[in-house]
From Swiss-Prot:
Pfam families: Mo25. It comes from the Eukaryota. InterPro entries: ARM-like, ARM-type_fold, Mo25. Belongs to the Mo25 family. This is MO25-like protein At2g03410.
């Protein structure tokens, strides 16, 4: 085989099988209390070398690009004999470089095709407990958590995986994960959370329609009301993107018809940081643009008209944004001309 295997004696399938055997051997040696430490170290060293070789096949190295035929053989063997599960399970026992390599292998395999099929998606659909392991892994210490988020970011690109997480208890964990004290882990968790709520539009729309009350109660309370600056900013931006997506139009109308939701946005508009104010504005304008505003929403907008107009007069992004200025002018004009008489119109 050309490229990577010009001077290699082992074929991809053989390396995969040896890797799987070494993982099993490392586990059995760990269970033997009288096993010699040097023997365990030798097994782990060989395992790390194999993992490095697998990564080189998928990504290439300084001497050669990846060989499609080699990637195909590796992918086929990897999923044929369920190597993904033990590799993920072995990550805590690997050294740092091998952990990085294993993470990259799992991520890369999500994109590999066999006869135009994403075999990783098919595999995960039948082995969803692997996703449970990745989600639970984020609860590990800082260094390990980054490897699990790195793998999961690629897995949630599969619609079947995103749907499973949305409809399982796993989703609830992300309301905490996005607020973890380690910034890099929280950032990764936020990216996964965004993928779950934006990539697969039909799945998201169906989920939000069925779980509206629970989801937005959690979202409002944990992320928009009690979250840190980082959490509030990310959550308000994501919420705006979700509500303004056409596939979520029914959810958007329901959200902007709630007085409680309006109050949350008005509180965010009073945040001392302009970035949060700007994100909140993009959601607030949906309440104002609603042609069928409920009576209580019209009343609170009229009652707070002066404060809102004064706040918006000074609200500007750092860089000139014609679109923002146009939206702001429309919102301010609507609020300025709003009257309690409009309640009757809204009720028709």
């Amino acid at each position: 085989m050309k490229g990577l295997f010009k001077n290699k004696s082992r074929l991809p399938g053989e390396i995969v099988r040896q890797t799987r055997d070494l993982i099993a051997l490392a586990e059995s040696e760990e269970e033997e209390t009288d096993a010699r430490n040097s023997k365990r170290l030798g097994i782990c060293a060989e395992l790390c070398r194999n993992i490095r070789d697998l990564k080189s096949i998928l990504y290439g190295n300084g001497e050669a690009e990846p060989v499609p035929e080699a990637c195909l053989l590796l992918t086929q063997e990897f999923f044929r004999a369920d190597t993904l599960r033990p590799l993920i399970k072995s990550i805590p026992k690997l050294d740092l470089e091998a952990r990085k390599d294993a993470t990259q292998i799992v991520a890369n395999l999500q994109k590999q095709q066999v006869e135009f099929r994403l075999v990783a998606s098919e595999y995960l659909e039948s082995n969803l407990d692997v996703i449970d392991s990745l989600v639970e892994g984020i609860d590990h210490d800082h260094e390990l958590a980054l490897h699990y988020t790195g793998m999961l970011k690629e897995c949630v690109r599969h619609q079947v995986v995103a749907k499973y997480i949305l409809e399982s208890k796993n989703l609830e964990k992300f309301f905490d994960y996005v607020q973890l004290p380690y910034f890099d882990v929280a950032t990764d968790a936020s990216k996964i959370f965004r993928e779950l709520l934006t990539r697969h539009k039909s799945t998201v729309a169906e989920y939000l329609a069925k779980n509206y009350e629970w989801f937005f109660a959690e979202y409002n309370t944990k992320l928009l009301e009690k979250g840190s600056y980082f959490t509030k900013r990310q959550a308000s931006k994501l919420l705006g993107d979700v509500l303004m997506d056409r596939s979520n139009s029914g959810v958007m109308v329901k959200y902007v018809s709630s007085l409680d939701n309006l109050r949350i946005m008005m509180n965010l508009l009073r945040e001392p940081t302009k970035n949060i104010q700007l994100e909140a504005f993009h959601i607030f304008k949906l309440f104002v643009a609603n042609e069928n505003k409920p009576e209580d929403i019209v009343a609170i907008l009229v009652a707070n008209r002066t404060k809102i107009l004064r706040l918006f007069a000074d609200l500007k992004p750092e860089k000139e944004d014609v679109g923002f200025e146009t939206d702001k002018a429309l919102v301010m004009n609507e609020i300025a001309t709003l009257s309690l008489l409009d309640i009757k119109t809204a009720d028709r």
